[in-house]
């Protein structure tokens, strides 16, 4: 694929630059450059289709005026321009205060962006390669979008990237089960690189969006927040690639920084799709925003917030680690609160290998609806396909691996569910009697028969004796050979 080859060439050029150290910096560098090219290509189109349209970026800093000419500025002058003029200008863009102000998007992206490259000549080579991609060409944009997702997957090897990466198959499955419609307010309070939002967009485009009005309705109802600079920048760029003209709904900030009670009725949402960071701990003082559930554990605080944010009949799908299911103390109170305020109708239990290589931890997909309390909970155990020991980088989880669960689900009304080798039902009373411990194992699993212990011990002794005999034979052969 030409796009893949182009981006690989760019990465190879960056590896020659002494200032770029590792995957995370390389991807960050790539992203702000692609962002400016995508914005400029969109500007070209909007200038033709919208009367009076003006780019959010001042003329001197528009891609077309400093980066597009292959024979343009290079070397030390280019490096100085980027560091001393371009970045300061974009970090301090003045906002118009009008709705849909794309200047906010640009300023937020560059707020914590950084130019890692030290060679102006290598920067020029990268710019010229990027110019080979036309983001107004739908076919090229689609191919680049596919490659961009692979680029996000590459973040798995970039340190603590697991905090904001969820496998595409998992996000697609959750979006499909939640079934968002255009106009329903959909929120991801810890959006990372935007995987849940893009899967929700694809789901709505495939099933419901038929007119420009419906598309506008879908876009206007999206909400997202990301705390860290790199995933925020990646998310905004991801939205642009998905044809969203104004991704200012992706805010850069900490959703947990507000007191829980300050979220009022007009901020409630219809849908929450999210994967709060595993094992994250918030800074001092954040727990004071949650007086009833005072803890520094990020996943717990997000769960409390989600219950608060949902409208009556609102629905959520949330990824949580096993620790949230069996934990005690604050976690127990939180699960009791969840089951009193919401119908926790389904928990899909995933194997430890789904989030490898950066996390080997049991995870769960919780599906619940605000309103009626929980009467019973269906559990579904997702297993690694037969013939495969675990999911991995080379054999990751795919959407087709969820097809059995989707067939069992019972449609929108969840009708006709039956207990199977993978599925079992637990009443709310049973869960309450367990102290709200939701770490309930599959009762249909048959324990592996390892055989009679005495027979196994005898076999072990015989095997060890055979090993000793072989070792003695080898010693004798070696001694004889050395004596010659």
Question: Can you name each region flagged by the protein language model?
Answer:
Residues 163-274, 279-281, 287-289, 296, ...:
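Conserved S-adenosyl-L-methionine
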Residues 26, 174, 229-232, 296-368:
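Conserved Class I SAM-dependent methyltransferase catalytic core
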Residues 343-344, 356-403:
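C-terminal, active-site-flanking charged/polar segments
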Residues 1-182, 247-257, 349-354, 374-383, ...:
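Non-catalytic, mostly N-terminal accessory regions of nucleic-acid modification and defense proteins
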Residues 17-21, 283-298, 322-330, 351-358, ...:
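Short, contiguous acidic/charged loop-to-helix segments that flank catalytic cores in large enzymes
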Residues 258-261, 279-282, 326-329, 356-359, ...:
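Switch/connector loops and helix/strand junctions flanking conserved nucleotide-binding motifs
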């Amino acid at each position: 694929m030409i796009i893949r080859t182009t981006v690989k060439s760019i990465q190879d050029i960056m590896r020659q630059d002494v200032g770029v150290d590792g995957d995370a910096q390389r991807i960050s560098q790539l992203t702000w450059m692609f962002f400016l090219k995508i914005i400029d290509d969109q500007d070209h189109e909007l200038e033709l289709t919208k009367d009076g349209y003006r780019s959010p970026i001042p003329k001197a800093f528009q891609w077309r005026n400093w980066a597009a000419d292959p024979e343009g500025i290079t070397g030390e002058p280019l490096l100085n321009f980027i560091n001393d003029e371009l970045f300061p200008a974009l970090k301090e863009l003045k906002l118009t205060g009008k709705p849909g102000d794309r200047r906010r998007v640009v300023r937020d992206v560059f707020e914590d962006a950084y130019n890692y490259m030290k060679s102006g000549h290598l920067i020029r080579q990268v710019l010229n390669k990027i110019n080979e991609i036309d983001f107004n060409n739908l076919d090229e944009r689609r191919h680049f979008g596919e490659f961009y997702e692979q680029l996000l997957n590459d973040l798995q090897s970039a340190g603590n990237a697991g905090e904001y990466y969820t496998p595409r198959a998992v996000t697609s499955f959750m979006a499909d089960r939640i079934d968002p419609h255009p106009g329903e307010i959909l929120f991801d309070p810890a959006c990372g690189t935007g995987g849940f939002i893009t899967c929700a967009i694809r789901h709505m485009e495939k099933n419901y969006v038929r007119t420009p009005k419906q598309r506008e309705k879908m876009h206007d109802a999206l909400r997202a927040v990301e705390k860290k600079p790199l995933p925020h920048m990646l998310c905004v760029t991801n939205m642009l690639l998905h044809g969203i003209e104004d991704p200012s709904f992706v805010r850069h900030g900490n959703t947990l920084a507000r007191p829980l009670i300050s979220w009022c009725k007009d901020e409630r949402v219809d849908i929450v799709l999210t994967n709060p960071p595993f094992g994250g701990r918030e800074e001092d003082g954040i727990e004071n925003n949650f007086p009833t559930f005072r803890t520094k554990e990020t996943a717990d605080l997000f769960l409390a917030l989600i219950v608060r944010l949902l409208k009556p009949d609102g629905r959520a799908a949330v990824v949580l680690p096993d620790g949230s299911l069996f934990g005690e103390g604050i976690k127990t109170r939180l699960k009791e609160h969840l089951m009193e305020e919401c119908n926790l109708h389904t928990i899909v239990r995933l194997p430890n290998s789904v989030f490898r290589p950066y996390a080997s931890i049991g995870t769960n997909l919780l599906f619940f609806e605000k309103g009626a309390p929980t009467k019973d909970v269906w559990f579904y155990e997702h297993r690694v396909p037969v013939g495969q020991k675990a999911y991995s980088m080379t054999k990751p989880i795919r959407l087709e691996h969820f097809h059995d669960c989707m067939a069992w689900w019972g449609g929108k009304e969840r009708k006709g569910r039956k207990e199977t080798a993978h599925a079992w039902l637990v009443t709310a009373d049973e869960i309450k009697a367990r102290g709200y411990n939701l770490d309930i194992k599959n009762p249909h699993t048959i324990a592996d028969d390892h055989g009679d212990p005495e027979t196994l011990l005898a076999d072990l002794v015989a095997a060890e004796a055979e090993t000793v005999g072989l070792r003695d034979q080898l010693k004798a052969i070696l001694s004889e050979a050395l004596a010659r």
